[in-house]
Every structure is written in structure tokens, then in C-alpha cells.
Amino acid sequence: MATGKQILNEAKDKMAKSGDALRRTLADIRAGRANASLLNGVKVDYYGAPTPLNQVASITIPEARQLLVTPYDESSLDNIEKAIYAANLGLTPQNDGSAIRILIPQLTEERRKELVKDVKAELEKAKVAVRNVRREAMDDLKKGNKDGDFNDDEFHDLEKKVQTETDNGIKNLENIAADKEKELMG
């Protein structure tokens, strides 16, 4: 059976991973600026196999609101253009014969508000994940207490520590989401 400290450390690690996952998810929500990660999910039909865009082309940011996609193999230019359209990112690629330029449109106020709603929805999912970790840790602690692995005082102390970690984890998630909201509305 795991010790109280092991249960607490495992819960801390899982809660930290929820924060990392939220950060990664929110990075994909664009804020009106060019960012190569906007194209992370794009798969290009490259000789019959769906291949991530970053493996068939270099993605650079020549200006604040422009991406430049330069294929390693110019024959794949049309497939790259089709893949960007098919990804439904709301972006319009412009093929100039040797590379593809993508202008990132300014976000409208309405679109910004929609994106903030998306941020809040992702925040809620992450909070649920943290609460599930808390529940698992509490269940493990109760089982350990019942099995006699630690006494009632240790159990209550560990229970408080798990709750403190949960509160800290949720506060961290809220800070991550608040930063993204500021970025979107800024």
C-alpha cells in the first residue's frame, strides 16, 4: 500500500499535469497574432500518407500577423494548401508558386468573446480533472486509514494537505486561463 506521502506526491504530479495540459490546449487558441502552433493539427497528404505539416515544410513568421509555409519539396505545395483549407482554421492560404503565405485576420470583438468562452470551457474541464485527482487521492487515503496504514490524526492531516494542493492546483488553472483571456481581449 502507498504511504500518505506517496499518495500526496502522486496527486501533486497529476494536478501539475492538468495545468500543463491546459496550457497546451490554450496555446492552440489563436489571439490574432501569427504563431506556428496554429498549424500543429494540419495533416498533409504526402505521397499517400497523412503527414504533419511541420514534417513537410518549414513554418516561419516574417511579420506579426503572417505565417510563411515553405515546403521542402515544391511538388507538395498544392497538397499543403488543400490541407490548410481542409483543417477549417478560418485561415486563407495564398500560394505564390514556391511558398504559402497565410495572413492572420484581426479578431473581431464577437470572435474574441467566443474564444474567451472556449477558454472558460477548457478551464472547467481542467478543474474537473483536478477534482477527480483529489477524489482518487481521498479514496486512497480512506482505504489506507481503514487498512491501518496510518492513524486518524495522520489521515486528517493528509486530507487537509490534499485539499490545499487541490486549491492551489485550481488557483493555478484559473491564473493560466486569466492570462489567456487577457491576451485575447488585449
Curated annotation (Swiss-Prot):
Keywords for the protein's UniProt record, in alphabetical order: Cytoplasm, Protein biosynthesis
A Gene Ontology molecular function term of the record: ribosomal large subunit binding
Main location: cytoplasm
Top-level taxon of origin: Bacteria
Subcellular localization, as worded in the UniProt entry: Cytoplasm
Disulfide links within the chain: none
A GO-annotated cellular component: cytoplasm
Key word Cytoplasm present: yes
Pfam hit, one: RRF
GO biological process, one term: translational termination
TM annotation in the entry: none
Family membership: Belongs to the RRF family.
PANTHER family: MITOCHONDRIAL RIBOSOME RECYCLING FACTOR PSEUDO 1, RIBOSOME RECYCLING FACTOR
Function: Responsible for the release of ribosomes from messenger RNA at the termination of protein biosynthesis. May increase the efficiency of translation by recycling ribosomes from one round of translation to another.
Protein name listed in UniProt: Ribosome-recycling factor
Organism: Limosilactobacillus reuteri
Taxonomic classification: Bacteria, Bacillati, Bacillota, Bacilli, Lactobacillales
